[in-house]
Structures are given as C-alpha cells and as structure tokens.
Amino acid sequence: MTSLLFAFSLFLSFSVGSIFPFSISNGPAVNDTLQNAIRSQRDVSKPIPIDRVGFSGVSLSLFFESEGYSSDSLSNLNGLLKENVDGVMIDLYWNEFTSKWQLCPAPFPNNITYTTASNRIVDVSWNNKTYKCDPNLSTDNIMSILNSFIRDTNTDVEANFMHVMYNLKSIHYEKSNQTISLENIYKEKNSNLNVVGMDTLNDTVSLLSSYIFTPTLLKQYQSTSNKYTNSSSSIRYIDSLNETQAIQDFYSQSTILMPSLQTVLLTQYKRLMVHVVTNDMAESSRSYQISSSDKDTIFFNSDLPASIFHTDNASADELCYELSDAYNGTDVNIAEFNKVSLNATLRLVVDDDKTPFTTKSLSKYVRCGYCPIFNSTEYSSQKVTEGNSSIISREFASNLFWSWAPGQPSGPDNCINCTRPTTNNTSKHSDDNGEEEEEGNNIAYKCVALTEEGWEVSNCYEKYLFACQNKLSRNEWKLNNSTKRNYFDIDDDDCPEGYFFSLPRSNIEMLSLMTTVKQENVNYPIWIDLNDITVENCFVSGGPYAQCPYQETVTTDKFVRMIAPSFVVAMVVLVLIFIEKVFRKTPIQTNRKRYWKKAIHEYYAKNDYEGVPS
C-alpha cells in the first residue's frame, strides 16, 4: 500500500505539473543572450528621461489587414512582447454613426447577422473597401494581453517600459439628404444589439489604468522638480557631482522636463505611456470631443510631441547623416548631438510593404535616435508559438539594440564576431615589498569594450583605450590615443579634468562616442565602464567592485504556480493517509490476536495449578 501511495503521488506530481506549469507562455521562450541584452540596456538607460529611452514597436494594422479584424489576429502579440517589442501602434476609428471607438475601419450594419455563435466574422464595406471584422473586437482585447504580460513581468529584473500609440481616424460621412439611407443602415436601432466599442478615449485603456504614467503624474513631477531646483541655493562644483547628478543636470536643460526611467519604472511602478501620435479625425459636429479626462490620462502632441517618419522617403535618413558626419578635423559638433538629446519628443520611423526595414537600415535608425515601428505585412506571415519565434526576432533581434553588437553579450566560446586579443596580456601589481611584478596570461571575459559593431564582452586584462565623458556635457568624449590600460587599472584620474571613465547611456550618447572615434582616428576596441564581474550576466557600471542590484524575485502569479503542484500533491497524499487510517481493515493482525488468545486460554486450562508451584 505504501508503494502504491508513492507511485500515485509521483503520477500526480507530473500530471499536476502539466496543469500548473511554472511558467505559462503563449509565445516563444526568449533565449538567455537576448534576455541579458534587453535587461542590461534597460539598466544602463535608467537615468535617462523616459521619452529618450529607445524602444521598438509593432503596428497592429499589419495583423488585422492580413488576417482580419478579430481576436485571433492578436495571437502573435504576446510572443512579440517577449521578444523586445515594447510598443504597440493602433489605428483607432471614431464611428460617427454609433459614437463609439472601434478597431474595424468600417461601420457595422444595424441588421447584422452571424453565421454561427462561435464565428462572428462578417464582411463589411466602407469607402469602396471590404474588411473582415468581428463586431465583438475592441481595445479591451489588446489591453488584456498587455495587462497579462505586465503582470507576468512585474519584477525589478523583468519589468520594461512600454508605449501604446494611437492613430485617431474617423468613420465619417457628410450630413445631407442623400445620407439618410446611410443612417438607416448604420445607426443603432435595435437596443438588444450589443454594440461593442468605447465611449471615450480614456475607456480604451481603462484595463491598464494602474500601470499608466499619465500627464497628471508628469505635472506633479515637474512641479516637485522645479521647487527643488528653485529652493536650492548651493552651487555645485564639477568635482562634487556624482554621475547621477551630472546626468540630471544635463537633461534638466531639455525642452520638456521628463522623469528618468528609474523614477517611473522602479519608483512610481508605472509600466507604460499612452500617446496620440496622429489625429486625423474629420472635422464634424459628430466628431469626438477630447475631454479633460482624456488629457489627464493620455499624452497628446501638446504634452509630448511625436514626430513620425516613413522609410519610403529620405526625411528619416537626413538626421542620421547629419549626426554621423557632425565632425571635422579638429572636433565633433557637440551642439548637433545636444540638440537631439535635449529635444523632448517621440521620434518614430515606420516601414511599409514597399520599403521594409533591412538589418542595415534598422541599425542606422536605432543608433541615431529613432524608435522603429514594424508595419510591413510580411512580418505577419508566420504564427509565433513556443519554440517558433517571429520573423522580427529571427531577422532583426540583434539590430534592435543601440548598445550591443550582434550576438552579445556573450563570452568568447559563443561569440561569432568577437574582437580577439591583440595585445600582450600582461599587467603589473605590487608585492608586499612595494616592488612591481608582472602577471601574465590572465583571462577574464567580464568587461565590456566598444567595437565598430557595438559593445562586446572582452578580456578585462587586455590593454585598450578607454572612454572619458564630460560630466556636464553627455555627448562630449575624450580618447587618449597614447594611454592604454587594462580594465582593472583604469581610474577617473586617468581622464582629463572635468571628465570621468564612463559609458553611453542612450543611443545619441553612443553615436556621439562613435563619431568621436572617427574624428580622433583611433582604433577599436575601447573600454567603457561596464562589467559583470561580481555576478554573471548582471552588467553594472562603477568599476570592477560595483555590485549587482538584484535579488532573485518572482511575481505573485509565478509564486502561486510554483507552489500549486506541491500543494495539490500534499493534499491528495493527506487525504489518502486519512482514508487508510479510517477505513482500512487488517484481517491478518485480527486473526493473529484471536489465535494467541485461544492458545493461552487452552494452556491455562490444561495446567490449572492450585496454590504456589514448588
């Protein structure tokens, strides 16, 4: 019986484990290298204003237009969110017939019928185009996916900052005698018909309200920051500034004062912003009127401007060329870089079927300050499932980072294009008598160097040039071509006065450093202040003794899934033990007691002595 109990409990542990897996996933598992790259770039960018932290996004129109406007078309979204896609662009239509926001570009006739209860897809036409739409589809379908992803990644280690971007459009008609027939077709007449849609813009994101960084929160931050600045009468000297203060001081000169990623993501615990990036609603008496409630939740261009560029024209390339060539024989044009760094705006570049992104063009856009939005329908040709990543991930994963080179961060064993050691691995240290001794053949692939392709994990004992950054001007760098150090020997005193050993924390800072390399005509690799010496794959700045800020954490949902299998198995085992104790009969033991009782009775009957035996 005991062995039977053990076998049954073992079976339960496997079966329950399949019911309550440790990690429920509707998309592909993200490989370790990609996950480390995502987290480390995010960590490096923590002091940077949130509007200048780069991200990549996807336009949902590419799924809807190729697969129809239904919830099934959103099946790839969760997988894309796990693959470093942090933005979702949505075309949102104001239906002037029903006065509701909807995702389908065409109005639904009021006499609409469905073929089956499970299949509610109907063909609807508008402006000489026909669409396949589900009348039940609404923004709640999108927001529930985002909400689930946010809940599953709501830890300091996994949390990322996201963007929901709206393109507002109208299902518009001109009021005239000829349009009475249209109103008879499309205006709601049957009160029993459940017209799906949202009454206000604010309603479209209500499922995510607790996670949204709003214009109201921005105003509170700006008010507090201005009071602090105005009340501070002390003069900060360059030497007394730490890096965080230096970054704050530089970006406080921005056109709009925005909080840092650290403040919003890890202090206020907000996970996303909602923007109206374009407003193409028709002017009409039936048009939607933006309310104060909408303005309290959603960013419009008056709060934070958005600039949208398209790959089918050269306007997006102009800024990239200007920054890449912003130098001459004597110095780098720092003013050009500062103009971009201090301009608070959302810079988006959107591709299409005629001019889709290439690996080369994508890397260029990301490095010069654009946030790419994938909009070509070729990206929707394959389902994203467990073990089957998206086309975006397979072809462009390495190009979505302004920081890391392709295949990084990775050690030399797994690296494809790593820069190999070219110098003698020799460093000097002092013994107990103060005499210098040479120490050779040291290998520690724990430090990060800048190469022409981006950041690479390199041997800390290699002697390279090192990047010195101006404390008060984030895009100004110095590279001493005559001084090379291994990573452990670099000190701030090795940099010119007013500079310190540092690293780029944004795409524009990265591009300004790479432009300085070209201007000063020095060779890669170049050390930057980043390493994972103390904890593997936890990349930190601050020298070789900088500590990893993370502990092993799990979300509440994951914790429940972790303990659920053990809890269920334990309860079943306890129930079985209880049943055994209460209902099990042991006839062998019962017979044994009866036999010995009879034997003893017969013995005393035959040997019945009187008195005390002698």
From Swiss-Prot:
Localization annotation: Membrane
InterPro entries from the UniProt entry: Telomere_Capping_Maintenance (IPR051008)
UniProt name for this protein: Maintenance of telomere capping protein 6
Residues modified by glycosylation: 31, 111, 128, 136, 177, 202, 230, 242, 313, 328, 343, 375, 388, 417, 424-425, 480-481
Highest taxon of source: Eukaryota
Membrane topology designation: Single-pass type I membrane protein
Extracellular topological domain: 18-558
Gene that produces this protein: MTC6
Keywords of this entry: Glycoprotein, Membrane, Signal, Transmembrane, Transmembrane helix
Spans through the membrane: 559-579
The protein's role, per its UniProt record: May be involved in telomere capping.
Signal peptide: 1-17
Keyword Membrane tagged: yes
Family: Belongs to the MTC6 family.
One of the record's GO cellular component terms: membrane
Cytoplasmic topological intervals: 580-614
PANTHER family the UniProt entry points to: MAINTENANCE OF TELOMERE CAPPING PROTEIN 6 (PTHR35518:SF2), MAINTENANCE OF TELOMOERE CAPPING (PTHR35518)
